[in-house]
Design a protein with these regions (language model features):
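Short secondary-structure transition/capping segments
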Residues: 4, 130-133, 225-227, 319-320, ...
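Flexible, glycine-rich surface segments
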Residues: 270-274, 278-282, 303, 361-362, ...
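Bacterial N-terminal signal peptides
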Residues: 11-23
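Ser/Thr-rich, Pro/Gly/Ala-heavy low-complexity intrinsically disordered linkers and tails
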Residues: 1, 22-48
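C-terminal functional module detector
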Residues: 46-72, 76, 80, 84, ...
Length: 489
């Protein structure tokens, strides 16, 4: 694995040239096999008919109808504040002065993206040396996020009055999220420990209440990941936004063309383009096969949560696009995708419960730039109902079925007159096993998960003068698995 300090960041001049000056064109991928759209009537109560593009997302409580009594909340995992040395165009914290405008961009972006809880994960070069209670950048009007009377984060009041919660963490060789204290009293020792990824480092972050995750799964090996999970790592990234764009990471680790997306995004980013600027991520929205494969392999034996890492730094493209906002704004990147968790209605307002739901794998990765999905559900119906993230003995569930309820597009989602095409692909131990909505009788032990794909015909009005190349199948939702283990596993 390449050390974090050696991992390249995107080249600003290269990106600016590719994004703003190259000729127009769509992506080069061809449509994937797809099934008919789910035609169930919508249960949400938003407006009907075409809806304009919106730079912000409504609060979760307004976006997601309850599913079997479960409420949905949006979480962001892997995000950088001015405490990261490479954030804010490399000027997050210079000569003892914090970049306040960049911090305000981050706070506003989280609110605009409808985020409920952000696990901010700063690099240790600066963060390890800050007092723990400075990691969440509290400002006037904020309230401490408390657990047992101790502050473990921050609560920001967004402009619409809803709360946004912030928990601190670190991203280096490990990515502990939700730190409740620094691992050591001495800042230098913090820095050293945060740069390690062995069992002692995992124990150290667990001892201060953090959930140990692994970022940049694409750069890892299965044997080392397995050892880290056995030592206490809770989850891994199945998608990382930095890797999706970075030419070197695409080429070396993802097996993708280095920079074919650069020319493709001109309809969204060029001054003469006619497509919605927010949609330029479609050019890189592809399954990150190495990361997903490692995650699947781990889940054949172990319980491993999968998340998507936003990895936003606001440090790549300061040039404004046609909407007047810099190309890599926090707001834009945070709107693209999130990690949804399901919690009981009684815990709908409890960020600590959302954290527990993520740790349990009662969660899914959702690419909400494709639209807000509502009504989807995946569960095992057997001797009892098994939810996402659960593990149970196969012998306890004879005759069980995997019930797959496909998503619908929320009524308030940006859309034209056309309906999306939605498909459900069921994977068992990482291999496609079934397809389609409905009940799928289980045929043996395995880790069962679902990927919902969408061909976004509903986005045609926002895709410029030549929308056809963009109307292909994209991953919309990755659920975490439900695991049924054989005897002795």
């Amino acid at each position: 694995m390449r050390p974090l300090s050696a991992r390249p960041r995107l080249s600003l001049p290269t990106l600016a040239c590719g994004a703003l000056l190259c000729a127009c064109g769509g992506p080069t991928s061809t449509p994937a096999e797809k099934a008919a759209a789910d035609s169930a009537p919508a249960a949400d109560t938003g407006p009907s008919g075409p809806q304009p593009w919106t730079r912000a997302l409504p609060a979760s409580a307004l976006s997601f109808p309850a599913v079997r009594g479960w409420e949905t909340r949006r979480l962001i995992v892997h995000l950088h504040s001015p405490w990261s040395h490479d954030a804010c165009d490399g000027n997050g914290f210079e000569e003892g002065v914090l970049n306040e405008p960049c911090l305000q961009d981050l706070r506003a972006g989280l609110c605009d993206a409808g985020v409920d809880l952000a696990f901010v994960t700063d690099h240790p070069a600066h963060a390890a040396y800050q007092p723990y209670d400075q990691l969440w950048h509290s400002r006037d009007g904020d309230q401490p996020l408390l657990d047992g009377g101790a502050a473990i984060g921050n609560t920001i009041s967004c402009a619409d009055g809803r709360p946004l919660h912030w928990m601190p963490g670190i991203e280096d060789e490990l990515m502990p999220i939700g730190l409740r204290a620094h691992v050591r009293a001495d800042p230098v020792e913090n820095d050293v420990m945060y740069n390690r990824f062995d069992a002692e480092a995992i124990d150290a972050v667990e001892a201060v209440g953090a959930l140990p995750f692994i970022a940049h799964t694409e750069q890892r090996q299965l044997d080392s990941l397995r050892a880290q999970v056995e030592a206490g790592v809770v989850g891994v990234e199945l998608f990382n936004l930095h890797a999706a764009f970075d030419p070197d990471l695409r080429d070396e680790f993802l097996g993708l063309e280095r920079a074919d997306w650069l020319g493709a995004i001109a309809p969204m980013t060029a001054p003469t383009g006619t497509a919605e600027p927010d949609l330029f991520m479609l050019a890189v929205l592809r399954e990150q096969t190495p990361s997903v494969g490692l995650w699947d392999a781990l889940n054949t034996e172990l319980d491993v949560v999968g998340v998507a890492g936003t990895d936003a730094h606001q440090n790549v493209l300061p040039t404004s696009l046609r909407d007047g906002e810099r190309g890599d704004s926090y707001r834009r990147m945070l709107r693209w995708f999130n990690n949804e968790v399901r919690v009981p209605a009684a815990e709908a307002d409890d960020p600590l419960a959302w954290r527990r739901a993520l740790a349990a794998g009662r969660a899914a990765v959702v690419f909400e730039l494709l639209g807000t999905p509502v009504g989807w559900d995946v569960r095992v119906e057997g001797s009892r109902t098994l939810e996402l993230g659960e593990t149970a003995p196969w012998t306890d569930h004879p005759g069980a079925s995997l019930q797959v309820d496909c998503p619908r597009l929320a009524a308030a989602s940006p859309k034209g007159d056309e309906a999306p095409e939605i498909d459900a692909v069921v994977f068992k131990d990482g291999v496609e096993w079934a397809r389609g909505c409905g009940a799928h009788p289980l045929d043996g032990p395995g880790a069962y998960r679902v990927r919902f794909d969408v061909v976004p015909h509903h986005l045609r009005p926002f895709l410029g003068d030549d929308p056809a190349p963009w109307l292909i199948a994209y991953p919309w939702i990755y659920t975490n698995p439900i695991r049924l283990r054989a005897a002795g596993r």
